[in-house]
Amino acid sequence: MLLGLVGSEMCIRDSIHRGKSSNVGNELQAMLQALKHRGPDSTGYALYADNDGENFIMRFKVGENVGEGSSSVNEDESVYDKRKELVDDMLKNLGAKVLKEEKLTPYSYRYEMKYDDDLMDFSKKIESIESVEILSIGKSLELIKDLGDAKVVLDRYDLGKVTGTHAIGHARMATESGVDIKSAHPFWGYPFSDVSVVHNGQLTNYWNNRRVLENKGMRFMSECDSELIAVYLAEKMRNGATLEAVSYTH
C-alpha cells in the first residue's frame, strides 16, 4: 500500500489503475520528468509491480552514489562487492532462499527470495552490515531511488518495462538533509512489506519526535524529516494498529 502525504503536490505524482495493469514505470517517469525543475537532486519510484505474489522482492544498496552517473561512487567497488558477499552469507544464515539476483549499479541490487520468518529480525541483521540499507521488501512493492532526474533513474534501473497496478514517485530538491540516496523519497515502512511513504512539506519538532521513536527501538537511516512519517507508521503497526487506522488518525 502506498501513502502520499502532501503540503502541496509540486513534487509528487502517482498512477493508479483499478482492476488492470499498465506500464507504471513509463507513466510515472513522464509525470516526474515534467517536475524536474521542482526537484533536480534525486528521484524515487515506489512501483507496485506485477510480480507473482509468492516471493519477496528485496531492493537494497551497499553504498551511496555521489553523482548522476551510475559509475560515480565514493568507495572502491571491491568494498561494495565484499558487502554484497556479507549480505549473501547473512541470508543463508537466516534461512532465506535467493531465487534470482540482479546487480543494478555498483552499489544496488534486486533479489527475489523466499523467506517465512520475522521481517524485523531479518532486516535488522541484514542492516547490521556496514553501509547496507534495505530500500524495500515486498511481494508487490519495489522502491527505487537515486540521484538524478526521473529519466536518469528510469534508464539506470531499466524501469521502463515495469508493469503494475499503481505507483507513486517524488522529485526532490534537498532542503532539510543531504543529497544522497538514503534521504531521497519514497521511504519504506520498515519492516512492513509493501508499505511506502512519500511526503512534501516540512515537519515540525522532527528531532523531538525522532528521539521518542528511537527510544522505542525504531530505526532511522537518514536525517530527512519525511522519514519520520514512515517510522511513525511502522511503530504504530508494530503495536497492532492497521495502516488504514493510522492513516486516518488526526
Regions from the PLM with identified roles:
Residues M31, L141-S196, G240-Y248:
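Conserved mixed alpha/beta core segments that line enzyme active sites in large multi-domain catalysts
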Residues T204-Y248:
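Short histidine
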Residues S8-E75, L104-E112, D117-L143:
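Extreme N-terminus nucleophile/cap motif
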Residues S22, D52-E54, T175-G178, T204-Y206, ...:
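Flexible loop/turn segments at secondary-structure boundaries
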Residues M1-G7, I12, H250:
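Single conserved hydrophobic/aromatic residue that forms the stacking wall/gate
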Residues I57-M58, G178-K182, W207-R211, A234:
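Short acidic, glycine/serine/threonine-rich loops at helix termini
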Residues G39, S193-N209:
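Conserved beta-strand-loop-short alpha-helix elements that form
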Residues D76-A96:
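Short amphipathic alpha-helix segments
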